């Protein structure tokens, strides 16, 4: 047996196995798509209107009703003079009232002329303002956003000039149109700025997606984002300023809007005027009824006086017509009686004329008051409608403010979303930068590995050739060992036992076969690994070359896109700078226009307020004058009523006194007549007894026969008593001269005393009436 020599010098087959190349997993570059930014919503048009109106402060004043005091007349004057004085006073009052009415008409004419002048002045101002508006519009025609604002200002100016001719409602409407136009212009400017901002944001987003993580461009984009944030903050501040302006205007409109108390006061005054009109109508009806009653009483008094005159003429007519003194006294008594009655009739007629004049004056005052009440009711309706319009405008302003608040909240929400999107875009940009840097690192490592593999290929070829040479040497050694073993077997005398030798030979063969199989397997494996390594290296080299070419193309494209984006960024910066400058100029011009419009609006509102206050003060003054005239008319009417009541009482008292005097006079005359009848009867009896009566009759017939033939109708025979009618039928016809003279003288004395008493009572009543009038006039003046 041969010892297993050289077994220690063999190289195991595992040493020649091909080691797989350590390949790192390939990381494909992640390219991010463009991230669209959510654009902020556009602003909605919100029409805001002002109210300028204006709560006019009502200044009420009342003047004391001053009435001319009537000086008490002298008690010695007659009733006719007092009636003429009353008529002259009434004529003076009527003349003063006519002068006052003329003065009022002149004032109304002057007010109309001033209103026409104001209208002409306002029209001239409107034309001037229109010319200024045209000049401003022609000077700033190139600014698109400002054009709408100037158009709104033009509309506001025109509406203001038209509204100065109307009431407070037109002023408020014009103010609201101005606000709507200004808000529209501001919204258009904001929309233009937002559109520019959106364009900048789009360019920024495209820039951020294409520049693939350039730090400098990212910083510039961040600066652009900061500028946009500042612009958004500025726009938000402008919106807040507009909201504060709207709130101030709402407060101003709320202060200028007339309250419901004013309408309630107008309603109360109207109700009071209606009540006074009703009272005046009732007083007029009652006065008409009293006048009719007084006329009926005057007619009855005239009839009664006529009857009394007839009775007096019938009773007091003398039997002897040759008495001139008796007729003169009777005629004077009748004349005085008639004068008294005529004075009473003149007084009643004067009172009736005065009453008719006062009734006419009251009717005119009632008509004027009715006209004033209707005009005031119309003004009240106009004011109520204007108040309703102002309430609706305030509601519209509230809705506009709510819309602005909603728009502001939307803008804030859009700004917040934009900030979130910018933050996410920045995060994605950082991720893109990291991915690009990692891809570059991976590419560098793969290139290094490829270079290392390419560098290891010659060493692997050397190792492979060395392994082949080793295999050949091992085969030669094995063949040499086999040859030596055969020689030894041939040279050895006796081989060992066959079993041991065959066993060892079998083991050697098995080992040889195994080694041969291992060598063949290792050779095949080495060849396969070498082929695989070559293929893999070639594929990786081709792939890496493709990746390198693609990266070079992408790098070139990115450089070109970065250059174009740089140009676009410069253009966008210039456009943004121009837009910011234009926006600043527009804001400045808008603020100037707002200040000018605010000043013009305040001036117009102040002018309208002053004019309305003057009109209100004029109407209040006229109303106070009408009230004073009404109070004077009421006072004069009450005085007339009191005078009528006093005259009524005095006439009743006079009639009662006349009735009593007539009754007493009738009773006294009846008693006197009875006494005269008794005396006559006694005298006739004595004359008959003495025989003197027949002689007197003869003498009397001879003396008065011619006069009796002429004056038959004037002789009235006295009634005969029933006692002596049968005894003396002729003697009772003619009384004695002395008895008739005594009875007539007594009767005349009694009548004179009665007339003097009546005249004294009338003078006392007149003095009492004058004292009452003089005491009532200070009370009315106080």
UniProtKB/Swiss-Prot annotation:
GO terms for cellular component: centriole; cytoplasm; nucleus. Residues 82-314, 344-437, 498-691 form a coiled coil. InterPro entries: HCR. It is found in: Cytoplasm; Nucleus. The keyword Calcium does not apply. Residues 62-82, 182-218 are annotated as: Disordered. Its main location: cytoplasm. Residues 62-74, 208-218 have a biased composition (Basic and acidic residues). The keyword Cytoplasm applies. GO terms for biological process: cell differentiation; protein export from nucleus. It comes from the Eukaryota. Keywords: Coiled coil, Cytoplasm, Developmental protein, Differentiation, Nucleus. May be a regulator of keratinocyte proliferation or differentiation. This is Coiled-coil alpha-helical rod protein 1. It comes from Pan paniscus. The gene is CCHCR1.
């Amino acid at each position: 047996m041969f010892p297993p020599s050289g077994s220690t010098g063999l190289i195991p087959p595992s040493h020649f196995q091909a080691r797989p190349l350590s390949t790192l997993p390939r990381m494909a570059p992640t390219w991010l798509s463009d991230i669209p930014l959510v654009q902020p919503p556009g602003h909605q048009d919100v029409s805001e209107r002002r109210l300028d109106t204006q709560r006019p402060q009502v200044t009420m004043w009342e003047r004391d009703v001053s009435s001319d005091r009537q000086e008490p007349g002298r008690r010695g004057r007659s009733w006719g003079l007092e009636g003429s004085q009353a008529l002259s006073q009434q004529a003076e009052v009527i003349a003063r009232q006519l002068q006052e009415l003329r003065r009022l008409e002149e004032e109304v004419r002057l007010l109309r002329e001033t209103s026409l002048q104001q209208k002409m002045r306002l029209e001239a101002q409107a034309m001037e303002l229109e010319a200024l508006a045209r000049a401003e519009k022609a000077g700033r025609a190139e600014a698109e956003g400002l054009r709408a604002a100037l158009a709104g200002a033009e509309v506001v100016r025109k509406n203001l000039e038209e509204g100065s001719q109307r009431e407070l409602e037109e002023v408020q409407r014009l103010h609201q149109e101005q606000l709507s136009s200004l808000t529209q212009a501001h919204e258009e400017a904001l929309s233009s700025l937002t559109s520019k901002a959106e364009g900048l944001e789009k360019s920024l987003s495209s820039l951020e997606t294409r520049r693939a993580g350039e730090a400098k461009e990212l910083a510039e984009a961040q600066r652009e984002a900061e500028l946009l944030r500042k612009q958004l903050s500025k726009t938000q501040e402008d919106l807040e300023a507009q909201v504060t302006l709207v709130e101030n205007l709402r407060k101003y409109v709320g202060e200028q809007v007339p309250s419901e108390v004013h309408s309630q006061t107008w309603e109360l005054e109207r109700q009071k005027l209606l009540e006074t009109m009703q009272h005046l109508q009732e007083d007029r009806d009652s006065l008409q009824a009293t006048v009719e009653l007084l006329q009926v009483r005057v007619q009855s008094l005239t009839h009664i006086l006529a009857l009394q005159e007839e009775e007096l003429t019938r009773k007091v007519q003398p039997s002897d017509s040759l008495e001139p003194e008796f007729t003169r006294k009777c005629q004077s008594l009748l004349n005085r009686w008639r004068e008294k009655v005529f004075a009473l009739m003149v007084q009643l007629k004067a009172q009736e004329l005065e009453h008719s004049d006062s009734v006419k004056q009251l009717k005119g005052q009632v008509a004027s008051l009715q006209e004033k009440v209707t005009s005031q009711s119309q003004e009240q309706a106009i004011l109520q409608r204007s108040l309703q319009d102002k309430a609706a405008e305030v509601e519209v302003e509230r809705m506009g403010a709510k819309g602005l608040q909603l728009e502001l909240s939307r803008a804030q929400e859009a700004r917040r979303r934009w900030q979130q999107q910018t933050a996410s875009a920045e995060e994605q940009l950082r991720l893109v930068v990291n991915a690009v840097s990692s891809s570059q690192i991976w590419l560098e490592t793969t290139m290094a590995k490829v270079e290392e593999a390419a560098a290891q290929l010659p060493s692997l070829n050397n190792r492979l050739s060395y392994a082949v040479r080793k295999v050949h040497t091992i085969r030669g050694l094995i063949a040499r060992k086999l040859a030596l073993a055969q020689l030894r077997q041939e040279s050895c005398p006796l081989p060992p036992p066959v079993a041991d030798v065959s066993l060892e030979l079998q083991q050697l063969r098995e080992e040889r076969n195994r080694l041969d199989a291992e060598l063949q397997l290792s050779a095949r494996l080495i060849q396969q690994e070498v082929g695989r390594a070559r293929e893999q290296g070639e594929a990786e080299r081709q792939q890496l070359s493709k990746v390198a070419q693609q990266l070079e193309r992408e790098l070139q494209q990115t450089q070109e896109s970065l250059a174009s984006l740089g140009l676009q960024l410069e253009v966008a910066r210039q456009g943004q700078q121009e837009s910011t400058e234009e926006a600043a100029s527009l804001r400045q011009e808008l603020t100037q226009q707002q200040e000018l419009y605010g000043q013009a609006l305040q001036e117009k509102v102040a002018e309208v307020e002053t004019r309305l206050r003057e009109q209100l003060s004029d109407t209040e003054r006229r109303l106070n004058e009408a009230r004073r005239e009404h109070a004077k008319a009421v006072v004069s009417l009450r005085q007339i009523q009191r005078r009528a009541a006093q005259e009524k009482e005095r006439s009743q008292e006079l009639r009662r006194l006349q009735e009593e005097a007539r009754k007493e006079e009738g009773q006294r005359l009846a008693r006197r007549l009875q006494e005269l009848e008794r005396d006559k009867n006694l005298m006739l009896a004595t004359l008959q007894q003495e025989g003197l009566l027949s002689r007197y009759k003869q003498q009397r017939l001879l003396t008065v026969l011619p006069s009796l033939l002429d004056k038959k109708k004037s002789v009235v025979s006295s009634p005969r008593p029933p006692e002596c009618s049968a005894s003396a039928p002729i003697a009772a016809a003619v009384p004695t001269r002395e008895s008739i003279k005594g009875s007539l003288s007594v009767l005349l004395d009694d009548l004179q005393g009665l007339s003097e008493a009546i005249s004294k009572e009338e003078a006392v009543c007149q003095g009492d009436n004058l004292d009452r009038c003089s005491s009532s006039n200070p009370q009315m003046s106080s």
